[in-house]
UniProtKB/Swiss-Prot annotation:
The lineage of its organism: Bacteria, Bacillati, Bacillota, Bacilli, Lactobacillales. Quinone reductase that provides resistance to thiol-specific stress caused by electrophilic quinones. This is FMN-dependent NADH:quinone oxidoreductase. Keywords: Flavoprotein, FMN, NAD, Oxidoreductase. InterPro entries: Flavodoxin_fold, Flavoprotein-like_sf, FMN-dep_NADH:Q_OxRdtase_AzoR1, NADH:quinone_OxRdtase_FMN_depd. It holds the Pfam family Flavodoxin_2. GO terms for molecular function: electron transfer activity; FMN binding; oxidoreductase activity, acting on NAD(P)H as acceptor; oxidoreductase activity, acting on NAD(P)H, quinone or similar compound as acceptor. The gene is azoR.
Length: 213
């Protein structure tokens, strides 16, 4: 099963980060179950991401709609954006690695989504509203780290990264499934308690992520 890991942590190689640990545990499970397959990994803070600015994506999209010629730099940026979209669509399992920063996804996570949430590609507009186009058994597993507890209790309404990604991928793109595994309470709980719960949840989610049902 083609699987793409999208890591949105600015410090993606930090071995002490719970986000990194989550990703490494997922990779261990993947290698156990699919020894003959290779993961694709995209580190958002180690690649070029075209941004929605007047000079880049807004200009490119406007010219493409009007059939106008792109500048040399716009051609490069447009190809990068297209390659990101094609890479995304070619993987039916997406693992989105995301720390919670100020109750939200990181800036580059949003920029990445701007390059793949494209009308006519991953969703379309109709008279009755938008309709998702990612209907061929696409699934997303979100690996989230957070300093407090957001899966339940008084802070659960503020788990905006989960709400946002679920809306984009499941509600608007029509992914078949969206699941979250958390390393939460990292600032208030014993480290081993966090890791034990995380590992248990990850194993359960992994089985469902690759189930044939």
């Amino acid at each position: 099963m083609n699987t793409l890991i999208v890591n949105s942590h600015p410090d993606f190689s930090n071995p002490y980060s719970f986000t990194t640990i989550l990703q490494e545990k997922f990779i261990e499970l993947y290698n156990e179950h699919f020894p003959n397959h290779q993961l694709s990994i995209l580190n958002l803070y180690d690649c070029v991401l075209p941004e929605i600015t007047k000079e880049v994506l807004l200009s490119i999209w406007s010219k493409q709609r009007k059939g106008l010629e792109l500048t040399a730099d716009e051609i490069v940026q447009a190809k990068i954006s297209k390659d990101l979209l094609e890479q995304f669509k070619s993987h039916h399992r997406i693992v989105f690695v995301s720390p919670m920063h100020n109750y939200n996804v990181t800036a580059r996570a949003k920029t990445y989504i701007d390059n793949i949430f494209i009308a006519g590609e991953t969703f379309k507009y109709t008279e009755n509203g938008s309709v998702g186009l990612m209907t061929d058994d696409y699934r997303l597993l979100m690996l989230e780290s957070a300093g407090s507890i957001y899966s339940k209790g008084q802070y659960s309404p503020y788990e905006f990264p989960v709400h946002y990604l679920k809306a984009i991928f499941k509600d608007f793109m029509a992914f078949d499934d969206f699941c979250v595994v958390r390393a939460e309470g990292t600032d208030i709980l014993d480290r081993q308690v966090v890791l034990d719960k995380m590992n248990q949840d990850l194993r359960e989610a992994f089985e469902a992520f690759y189930s044939k049902e």
